[in-house]
């Protein structure tokens, strides 16, 4: 079975994030969406498991968007995505007081699906 290029890109980017020492996890979103799909849930569950093995670590949840909307709308969407991921982390057992949420809006270094993301960074 041949994977569509977008799905292949998501898989490769997710794998890179997960195998980079296990401290940074990346959740991707569809355009103009803050809903979590199954793959996003899986990444979040992995991040939560990692965070729960080190309860003294802080967990940063940083949302980004592509440039599909206005800068103000994109900041709001990135904040909404970060909150959605933070809520899922809490549902998976991560204490809410360990989470730092931030929405940064549009990214400059990437476009498309790579920009529509939330990064979960677990600091020891």
Each language-model region and where it sits:
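Periplasmic peptidoglycan-binding/anchoring modules of Gram-negative envelope and division proteins
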Residues: 32-62, 86, 123
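N-terminal hydrophobic targeting signals that begin at the initiator methionine
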Residues: 1-2, 17
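Second-shell loop/turn segments in exported
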Residues: 29-37, 71-75
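Envelope-exposed proteins and targeting segments
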Residues: 23-25, 32, 55-57, 95-97, ...
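Periplasmic OmpA-like peptidoglycan-binding domain that tethers envelope proteins to the cell wall
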Residues: 65-124
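Bacterial Sec signal peptide processing site at the extreme N-terminus
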Residues: 10-32
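Sec-dependent signal peptide recognition
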Residues: 2-9
């Amino acid at each position: 079975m041949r994977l569509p290029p977008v799905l292949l890109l998501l898989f490769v980017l997710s794998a890179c994030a997960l195998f980079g020492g296990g401290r940074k996890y990346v959740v991707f979103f569809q355009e103009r969406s803050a809903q979590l799909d199954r793959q996003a849930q899986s990444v979040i569950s992995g991040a939560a498991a990692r965070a729960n093995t080190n309860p003294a670590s802080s967990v940063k949840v940083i949302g980004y968007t592509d440039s599909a909307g206005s800068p103000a709308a994109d900041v709001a969407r990135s904040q909404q995505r970060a909150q959605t991921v933070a809520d899922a982390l809490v549902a998976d057992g991560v204490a809410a007081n360990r989470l730092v949420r931030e929405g940064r809006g549009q990214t400059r270094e990437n476009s498309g699906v790579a920009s529509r993301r939330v990064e979960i960074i677990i600091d020891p």
